[in-house]
């Protein structure tokens, strides 16, 4: 079972709200969020209600100044607990240089801290998650905007919620939960 605690002020101060399952609308529970403590599980949090807006992945740990470490404003409006058995088994991802799974393809079974070093491009236009859950990051070394990819085909970058094809790095969820 997961557990996440949201705090209105930095360093776990101010009014708090504890959550142990999906919550499509956090707005009635607090006005702003400036620190977060994840006691159990892995979570995706979103800037807007109903799991909309930009998602951010959080693993177990403390985030005393959430805005600074994640580059967010203080607007967290929904949260989703990721399945506790993510990443059990193998992980397999195919990335493509063009949309609709066309062009050069590379298959990955492991994390990739720098897409350009492995794929000779800063852009991934489509992909196919064959097994496991993966997180795409906008920048190398697992930094910047994040996108959670579940098993399935993503014919274009907008399918995983991005506005651009820029992917700097990606990793398997198993290594971080």
Curated annotation (Swiss-Prot):
Cite the record's note on assembly. Monomer.
User: Which positions fall inside the Beta/gamma crystallin 'Greek key' domain?
Assistant: 2-40, 41-83, 91-131, 132-174
Q: Which UniProt keywords apply?
A: Eye lens protein, Repeat
Q: Which organism is it from?
A: Aquarana catesbeiana (American bullfrog)
Q: What is this protein called?
A: Gamma-crystallin M1-1
GO BP terms in the entry: lens development in camera-type eye; visual perception
Q: Signal peptide span per the entry?
A: none
Query: Where do the TM regions start and end?
Result: none
The entry assigns this protein to a family as follows: Belongs to the beta/gamma-crystallin family.
What does the record give under GO molecular function?
A: structural constituent of eye lens
Q: Tell me the segments the record calls region Connecting peptide.
A: 84-90
Q: What is known of its domains?
A: Has a two-domain beta-structure, folded into four very similar Greek key motifs.
The keyword Repeat is assigned to this record: yes
Q: Which Pfam families match?
A: Crystall
Q: Write down the Gene3D superfamilies for this protein, in alphabetical order.
A: Crystallins
PANTHER family assigned: BETA/GAMMA CRYSTALLIN, GAMMA-CRYSTALLIN D
Q: What this chain does, per the record?
A: Crystallins are the dominant structural components of the vertebrate eye lens.
């Amino acid at each position: 079972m997961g557990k996440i605690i949201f705090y209105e002020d930095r360093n776990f101060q101010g009014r708090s709200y504890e959550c142990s399952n999906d919550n499509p609308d956090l707005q009635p529970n607090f006005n702003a969020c400036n620190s977060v403590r994840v006691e159990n599980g892995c979570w995706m949090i979103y800037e807007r209600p109903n799991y909309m807006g930009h998602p951010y992945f959080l693993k177990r740990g403390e985030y005393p100044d959430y805005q600074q470490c994640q580059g967010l404003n203080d607007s967290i409006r929904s949260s989703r607990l990721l399945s506790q058995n993510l990443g059990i088994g193998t992980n397999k991802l195919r990335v493509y240089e063009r949309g609709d799974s066309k062009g050069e393809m590379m298959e990955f079974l492991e994390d990739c801290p720098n897409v350009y070093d492995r794929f000779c491009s800063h852009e991934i236009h489509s992909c196919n998650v064959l097994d496991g859950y993966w997180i795409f990051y906008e920048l190398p070394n697992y930094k910047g905007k994040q996108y959670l990819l579940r098993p399935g085909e993503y014919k274009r970058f907008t399918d995983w919620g991005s506005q651009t094809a820029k992917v700097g790095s990606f990793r398997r969820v198993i290594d971080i939960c």
